[in-house]
């Protein structure tokens, strides 16, 4: 069983305002799935519909009267912050001060003062703010007359910075302690710092990344990201079925960093980065190993160490209703990574990948009940291929908690090409507990034979695999805890626990 626990503070509180017409409810699921709004005009009744977690659907006339709407202008936009007690004022009667700069928030909006009011732009702006990791909850209200509209955003921020303490044990390094620091809103501009240090009796591992996001209000300024990392684990490609000549399992170490720039174009986010990774294969005492027990090479260079210098370009389109535990929408990510033949191994390759996720709300058994685990279908498709020569440790390892459940990590295939399809039916059990029925299928399309040393073929990995099962999702102070019981098409049964949704 692999257990990963991260401390995440999640608070869900509904905000309502007097004399304001609500056009979207909060991300909280504590409200019913519909609510009615009646305008002050006597000739028309307007109803606003809401999905769980506050996804704004729109305004729909409920009678057959013909009505003319004037082109009302957005007169003013106000930003208000609320605290964890759902209050706009502090104990001294002063407005709550948020960390986020109000100019930054307004700069993210498409609907600005002086422009013609449009429902579709308001919906897009609301979803854009809800996808920011620094915000826990976003509401928008409007005040309007015949000619103008005032928009009032009420925002509850997440509790950052946060300090994460943890520890555990694994078969590679034994007992370890972990310290993490995370801030998603540095300088009030949603800049991000995420660092983790893990210390054990065998080594020190770390992962640190700073990201300054692209800001639409500063179109001539590019965002940027800097990362450094060092980690080691049991190899998923060279697993325990064939060990080293001394009987040890193959350990895989990775050390490196990256520097990238970020830019957004309409609804697309793009990134290009320069990356360096040194991959080394080692035994239990972390001595470099060149071949396994059968004499098969572990690296392209033949030394047990390969250097990867790459240029990565990726684009993504995020249309989820929110970033964390989304309830509807989709996200598409496409990437290409070109390796430059420098360093050990002289590696020249191109790695292409695509990832698509769709969230579809359904109402088969939930009946609109308030819940933190709304009923829905979640669908994920992935595909990838590598052209050229590449380290066998960098093959696509299929199988495990984040691919085909019911199999161990890398137990389905280690291939040059892969395709993956997953479907989950998520449904509420109680307010904070949800259930999941899932199925996963993946294949290497026969490409394991083209990987250097054929590690997947020699270890009798099937090349394709199917898994299904059920799981629980529990909303807790640690975040969303996921427990999945998977059954493989070979009859293997595995129960694993981690945090966060599978996708």
Pin down the residues of each PLM region.
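Short beta-strands and strand-coil junctions in structured, solvent-facing domains, enriched
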Residues: 87, 114, 160-162, 187-188, ...
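Periplasmic polypeptide-binding modules associated with outer-membrane biogenesis and secretion
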Residues: 2, 20-171, 175, 180, ...
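Transmembrane beta-barrel strands of outer-membrane/channel proteins
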Residues: 165-169, 179, 193-199, 224-232, ...
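C-terminal beta-signal and terminal closure region of outer-membrane beta-barrel proteins
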Residues: 450-503
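Bacterial N-terminal signal peptides that target proteins for export
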Residues: 1-7
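C-terminal outer-membrane beta-barrel translocator/porin domains of Gram-negative envelope proteins
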Residues: 299-304, 308-447, 454
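Gram-negative/organellar outer-membrane beta-barrel architecture
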Residues: 131, 137-314, 320, 398-405, ...
